[in-house]
Amino acid sequence: MGKAKKTRKFGLVKRTLNTKKDQRLKKNQENIKTKEDPELTRNIPQVSSALFFQYNQAIKPPYQVLIDTNFINFSIQKKVDIVRGMMDCLLAKCNPLITDCVMAELEKLGPKYRIALKLARDPRIKRLSCSHKGTYADDCLVHRVLQHKCYIVATNDAGLKQRIRKIPGIPLMSVGGHAYVIEKLPDVF
């Protein structure tokens, strides 16, 4: 008969409690309670009085449409007239608006986008002045929409669309196919 093989037994170390992280100890429970401050108030933004059951009553014809840089570029690619396309999409009169930041962004893009710049200088498109520093158009549009919820935002930028979707009651317009598409416009009118 052979000898029975004796293998070494691993992991026979006695377990000890970690007193710093063990939640069963009284002093650690007290530390957890002190971290939870009952006076901590949640920061809830003030909801506009124009919003009634998720419909923005401030948006009515003639619609004020804020235009982004890439919306103009996509309109040129798809050969859609901006003012006529907006009126066909919304079935009402609309006022296309462009901010100084969007114009500055178009000017920075250089001669490749000169047709878009020429289209943005169209007299039918009204120009809004900006009083803030910097020329980042996305931040400018989001800031303007947060101040006054009476605009429709026209953009094809996915990042800007995500930011605008977080703001309740603001419709989005984008270029889809060879026409404009609107999101979240109430059927009240």
UniProtKB/Swiss-Prot annotation:
InterPro entries in the cross-refs: Fcf1/Utp23, Fcf1_PIN, PIN-like_dom_sf, PIN_dom
Keywords for the protein's UniProt record, in alphabetical order: Nucleus, Ribosome biogenesis, rRNA processing
Annotated organism of origin: Saccharomyces cerevisiae (strain ATCC 204508 / S288c) (Baker's yeast)
GO biological process terms, semicolon-separated: endonucleolytic cleavage in 5'-ETS of tricistronic rRNA transcript (SSU-rRNA, 5.8S rRNA, LSU-rRNA); endonucleolytic cleavage in ITS1 to separate SSU-rRNA from 5.8S rRNA and LSU-rRNA from tricistronic rRNA transcript (SSU-rRNA, 5.8S rRNA, LSU-rRNA); endonucleolytic cleavage to generate mature 5'-end of SSU-rRNA from (SSU-rRNA, 5.8S rRNA, LSU-rRNA); maturation of SSU-rRNA
Protein name from the UniProt record: rRNA-processing protein FCF1
Similarity section: Belongs to the UTP23/FCF1 family. FCF1 subfamily.
Main localization category: nucleus
PINc domain residues: 63-162
